[in-house]
Amino acid sequence: YHVSYWGRPHDYLWLGTFSPALLYNQMSRAYDSGIRKMWILNVGDIKPAEYQIELFMDMAWNMDTVRSTGWKKHFAGFLHREFGSRADDILPLMTEHFRLAFIHKPEYMGNTRTEERDPKYTRISDLPFSEEEILERMDCCTRISDKVEKIGRSMRPADMDKYFQLVKYPVQASAQMNFKLLHAQLARHGKSEWEKSDAAYDSIASLTETYNRGFSNGGKWNGIMDCRPRRLPVFNKVERTPSAEPLPAFPVPAYEWNGIECTAGSFTACEGLGYEEKAVSVAPGDAIHFDFKTEADTSVLVELCLLPVHPVDGRNLRLSVSVDGGKEHSVDYATFGRSEEWKMNVLYNQALRRIVLPLDATGRKHRLTVKAVDEGVVVDQVRIYAPDDIAALQQKRKS
């Protein structure tokens, strides 16, 4: 299992942003599938992934003990051991940090790739984000970065080295990477100043220098933190290249749910997993239901946002979708390694499927049913759009 990765579609060697929720979910599934003799973890540089390593090792040693509390309480115990009562303030900031990185890792924010023949992937370019999405993400980064800074001011000097290494550096360096690339994206379209992107680049260098120098540890870890692994283009200062194209705007869904917000059904909540930490696992043969109402449409476009995983049994990863107990439409979202769809699933941590479903009547409530066929189905989010929205949504990301 990898919590650090070198390869396509893009490395993540810098910060330990791998989702503990995903690690917990997938190793639990492996354990339940009978894989209990040997687990191997690829950690790369040990320092950035200290918590993920501890979670993995504790699950391997005694899965039942970790399961008795869940990974968040396990993480809280880790933080309490290191920071005492301050852990209560740190925990929500770190879980939000992991959530943002689950949506898009800091190393992915430049829309570049590794091991691609097309040279366009070596150039930093726009992500398919609207201005609203960009500003919302930067606001989230600012909030946790500011709170981490405030806690650090009251941290005991003896604890500053570990606080900086475990909390402040990963949260603030990740935030600055987002600022560097998102301000650049806005600046390309005349919506921000290039100087803000450049300042974020300088901040990353300054934070890294502090990490390596240390506070009272005599430079024990000097040189271990490199903020430009493999000197990939995404780590560079962003070239000032204006764009004549407007920032994209995307359709707003008529309805949007996280998996756990289903009206009814049989599911298992996946602690802390998903874009809003509300994904659910649906066992084969079980279903979840979402109620909605339309006024005039005779059909709806359903967008399924699923956790991208490999098939557990065989080659398929199937579910079915239906409305009002009607025909079940089969959906298979299994992918093959190194395919374009697989790469997009890795970069965005969601597998997308869109399907237009007919409605028998308008102006009344309808029930959308999502039923798992194969083992491994995890539903993160479900959205309903007007059928005509499909072309614009395909511009954001193909399904």
State each model region's role.
Residues 1-259, 365-366:
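Substrate-binding groove of N-acetylhexosamine-processing glycoside hydrolases
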Residues 221-399:
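Extracytoplasmic
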